[in-house]
Amino acid sequence: MRKDVTPMMRQYLNIKDKHKDAILFFRVGSFYEMFFDDALEGSKLLGLTLTKRENVPMCGVPCHTSKDYIKKLILLDKKVAICEQGLQTDPKGPLEREVVEVISPGVVIDEDFLQDDINNYLIAISDYKDYYSFSYIDLSTSRLGIILYEGNFLEKLRRDIEKYSPKEIIVSEDFYYEYLEKLALDRFLVNKIPHWHFDKEIAMKSLKEHFNVLSLSALGFKEDEPYYVSSFLIIDYIKNNLKNLLINIDTIHINNDSEYMFLDDVTQINLELVKNNNDLTSCYSLYSVLNDCKTPMGKRLLREYILNPLLDIVAINNRLDHVEFLNNNINLSMKLRDILSNVWDIERIISRLQMKKYVKKDFLLIKESLTAFFLAKRLLNEHSFSYWIFDVNDENNIREIYSLIDCSISKEPDELIQHGYNFEIDRLREIKNNASKYVDDYLNFERNFSKISSLKIRRINVRGLFFEVTKSYYGQVPSHFIESQTLNSVKRYKTNKLIELERDINDAEDNLLALEQEVFDDIASKIVKHSVVIKKIANFFAYVDVVSDFAYLAKKNEYVRPTLTNNKEIILECSRHPVVEHYMKGVEAFTKNSVKIDNDKYFCLITGPNMAGKSTYLRQTALVVLMGHIGSFVPANQAIIGITDKIFCRIGASDNISKGESTFLVEMNETANILRNATQNSLIIMDEVGRGTSTNDGLAIAYSIVEYILEHIQARSLFATHFHELSAIKHDSFVNLSMKIERQGDELIFLREVEEKPSLNSYGIYVARIAGIPLKVIERANVILKSLTSREHLYVPEFFTSATLVINDGEEAMKEDLSYELELNDYLELKNFISKIDVNNITPFQAMNLLSEIILKTKT
């Protein structure tokens, strides 16, 4: 440290040294100042003017507007350390200063920094002693959870990072560098903790102290299996950065992985469950279609349901029963949704109360939400709705909370505590509000007593209140008047009564603020004692919101209740893609398609041209199956769905430049994951596997994958391909499907309907033509196609000579499709020739020659 720095700058450098990874907001008077590198970075990110003092770069923001600047930095994934100033304990030194909190993207609780429909997660990953675990917390809702990894660690971790989309991650330094590329950790704000900080004994002690338990078994852990280290990392991080904001974390939820369908990260992305792959917003996702929830808690729960489909038929049917009840009683559902629209985010509000970060509005919003609770209770009781999670004691506590807020918190904008709740507050407020009246009353009393008609009471800051008497009345001044100042034409006086009155008025203002805050804090502490029941209300509202939303959408979109079974089957009659149908509404009618997969016929190969609807058919099947598992009605006329332990969706791929992986390698990695982890109870969706390499290589790989799924995994599968040769496979569980096409003259009409037969042509040249490929290229492609189709053994390479392949099946259909393609190309060539004839600029003789040429072309 430089020896010539000022005491304040030395103080700054000492504090900054403890918060190297944060931008330090250093309080100086009414500003937060930034210095050195923080000033350089802060001025650039916040658009502030950069200045210098004694060659030290600096910039600052006013304290009263600092929230806006902090928000900007948080949105840019920066940490902000807030350093406040206190008293000057050393006359020769600077004011006392300390960091009161470190605000970072993963631990924000201010509603202005949050989205109401998305949880804001901080996660910690621990690999201590090879006990892998993943802990997560949304501090704004106080929910801390942990997932224990006992196998397939990396696949599950990828899944959960995608599922929780954390704002911030805590890992060991060793873990970070080992898995940086495998998990693409550089996408996130990562806190790298020294490996020595990972200690089982310290973790146990810290968790026991925080949760006030004698043994971690009370939290559901075995102390000799230190999975809990990841939860310790979160508790320790919050404790060090947010001081006293741990009170709201009162339990750890241990997730049971086996209760939920496995959706790996690739499947979540490819099915666009909660965000699209274009701008990563929720628009055009399944969530955007299903989200017509009325409450923030309901929106967040819906997102959780979509990412965690249930596997237990009883639990699914319980949820479906509630949806069906509300669907059959749609008037009840609509009234309930009206009530829910008056419910506020009490899950986050009660967390703010627990962390002592509340404002008056929070109490009024709780009260308004409790009013909605009583209305909802009465409505549901009238219709005998079966879902109720409260006992008599809960209901008494809820009424107590409502009564407390109703009688204590003022609705008036300039008052905190309601009149009548506290006598002393009423007295002080009455003095404050009527100060001028008291002064006027006393002035009138002294005027009458002294007979001085011009007597006045004035006030100046340095002297306070005083009487003012002009020269002509000096002789009438009462004896109890105490002279305080003489001017040219007037004298100023005080009285003991005036001094007492002034003191009462001044004290009333100061004491009122302090007493109101004291009483306000007391009310908050009384409500916090009932935080468990308030969180219960939040959970109740969230669930009722989601099931009433499902009921409303089922009625609106003509969804049906699915039947869940333990059989290996997916039978969907006239199913639709929920997202495509939603966004096409009013533009084009969606083409319905059926799906029939059972224990005997479980592998469907789908062929046909691009643009015909193969990918839509694949995705809609997966989405309908998933919707059934979350307890929603589904877009179909009938749906029978066998419980599906995992959905794998390999559709589309792009290269990963940062990892040096080509599109083909990415595709093979995804395929390898499916083949390693799928079971016979899974659903596999694969599209165009084998592209990106040579035709023979791709065909060989695709065939081998189909064979492996059929013979070894035996999972329900939909496999779309342009390798038409695969349609000749013969297997008892193999079904050929294709996209129906209608020919109208020289045009192809894609009907987007699925039929049970192979398509042996992709009509690629036709698709290229309507896409606008230059005609010269199209003509050349036709020539090359004729050459290729004249070769022998084009469609059946030598390695397809096994007994599982039937070469002759579909050969006639193949020839028919090829013949049509060639005829279409000849027609287009002739059409192009005729269209170039300029009839206004040819002689009769030239016309005869052209006609002869046209006749010759039609014959050949």
Swiss-Prot record:
This is DNA mismatch repair protein MutS. This protein is involved in the repair of mismatches in DNA. It is possible that it carries out the mismatch recognition step. This protein has a weak ATPase activity. The keyword DNA-binding applies. GO terms for biological process: mismatch repair. SMART domains: MUTSac, MUTSd. GO terms for cellular component: cytosol. The lineage of its organism: Bacteria, Pseudomonadati, Spirochaetota, Spirochaetia, Spirochaetales. One of its GO terms (molecular function) is ATP-dependent DNA damage sensor activity. The gene is mutS. It comes from the Bacteria. ATP binds at residues 608-615.
